[in-house]
Amino acid sequence: MTIRHHVSDALLTAYAAGTLSEAFSLVVATHLSLCDECRARAGALDAVGGSLMEETAPVALSEGSLASVMAQLDRQIQRPAPARRADPRAPAPLADYVGRRLEDVRWRTLGGGVRQAILPTGGEAIARLLWIPGGQAVPDHGHRGLELTLVLQGAFRDETDRFGAGDIEIADQELEHTPVAERGLDCICLAATDAPLRFNSFLPKLVQPFFRI
């Protein structure tokens, strides 16, 4: 796997600081599980953060703080799940959300053979899986906020470049594009958005509220 499109420094910093929403954190974590370069960059940021923590003066804990933390840890301890065969298209950070196989996900048809599955993340940002048949285009659209799209299988092209497995596209309000899945292998992506897309055609606008896109 040759990855050419990586997570930005700003996103990595926010991820390391724990300020990203769950949906965006899921996309970044999944990319890091595939990309040695970005994983090394994230490790360097963690090291810097740890060094700063060591230089910070200690703060006295309130009475009962330790007991509270230990109680939370006890609640989080669960029996290990039985071993299961991993789907190579669903790296570890994503596997907890989708189960054993991507085919078993509850997909919803959007039209033109395109399917989506919204994942159970908290907060206002939405994470979804997209399954786009080879050769199929996603309707042209712009963005009202940030959109991260990570390719898990296949590839797509738009007005900016080609994105293959492991690549991540970062789109903002400046980008309008028409992603087209390459012919052959279906393109499966993990995407996250913090605002509805801005479609240019009437039909996508009409169904947009029902599909939360």
Curated annotation (Swiss-Prot):
**Residues reported to bind Zn(2+) 2:** H141, H143, E147, H177
Per the UniProt entry, the effect of C187S is: No effect on zinc binding
Q: What are the record keywords, sorted? A: Activator, DNA-binding, Metal-binding, Transcription, Transcription regulation, Zinc
GO MF terms here are: DNA binding; metal ion binding
Q: Which residues span the membrane?
A: none
Residue numbers binding Zn(2+) 1: H6, H31, C35, C38
Quaternary data: Forms a 1:1 complex with cognate ECF RNA polymerase sigma factor RpoE; this inhibits the interaction of RpoE with the RNA polymerase catalytic core.
The name this protein carries in UniProt is Anti-sigma-E factor ChrR
The top of its lineage is:
Bacteria, Pseudomonadati, Pseudomonadota, Alphaproteobacteria, Rhodobacterales
